[in-house]
């Protein structure tokens, strides 16, 4: 996806840390996009059973990743399914351009 207006926060990677960042950014009313090439949850999505996550006795990594995504999207974050191929920073505009398979995304900050 190519954006005309810069978003506030672009997050590269949809693992637990990426979605935690997306949740906090979205709660702060920042326009937020997570760019993930694989499955929600990142590497945790490949785990068959998660039994040590506080408050959740047992579920699969794929289910936990899906919950991360639903939580972030429920607060207004967007998710792009694409592989990031590069990131440029323009000192004049103070903006980042994230290049990925779906186009370019311009952002004020990148995590």
Regions found by a protein language model. Give the residues of each.
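Beta1/beta-strand and adjacent pyrophosphate-binding region of the FAD-binding site
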Residues: 2-17
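Glycine-rich FAD pyrophosphate-binding loop
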Residues: 27-46
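Core beta-strand elements of the Rossmann-like FAD/NAD(P) dinucleotide-binding domain
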Residues: 5-7, 99-109
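Structural motif
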Residues: 9, 31-33, 109-110
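Gly/Ala-rich phosphate-binding loop of Rossmann-like dinucleotide-binding domains
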Residues: 22, 26
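N-terminal Rossmann-like dinucleotide/flavin-binding domain of flavoprotein oxidoreductases
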Residues: 45-104
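Flexible, glycine-rich phosphate/dinucleotide-binding loops
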Residues: 18, 41, 53
């Amino acid at each position: 996806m190519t954006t005309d207006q810069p978003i506030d926060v672009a997050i590269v990677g949809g693992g637990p840390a990426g979605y935690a960042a997306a949740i906090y950014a979205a709660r702060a009313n920042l326009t937020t996009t997570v760019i993930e090439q694989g499955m929600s949850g990142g590497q945790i999505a490949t785990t068959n059973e998660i039994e040590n996550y506080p408050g959740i006795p047992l579920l699969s990594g794929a289910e936990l990743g899906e919950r991360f995504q639903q939580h972030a999207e429920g607060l207004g974050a967007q998710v792009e399914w694409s592989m990031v191929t590069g990131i440029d920073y323009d000192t004049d505009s103070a903006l980042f351009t994230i290049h990925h398979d779906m186009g370019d995304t311009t952002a004020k900050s990148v995590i």
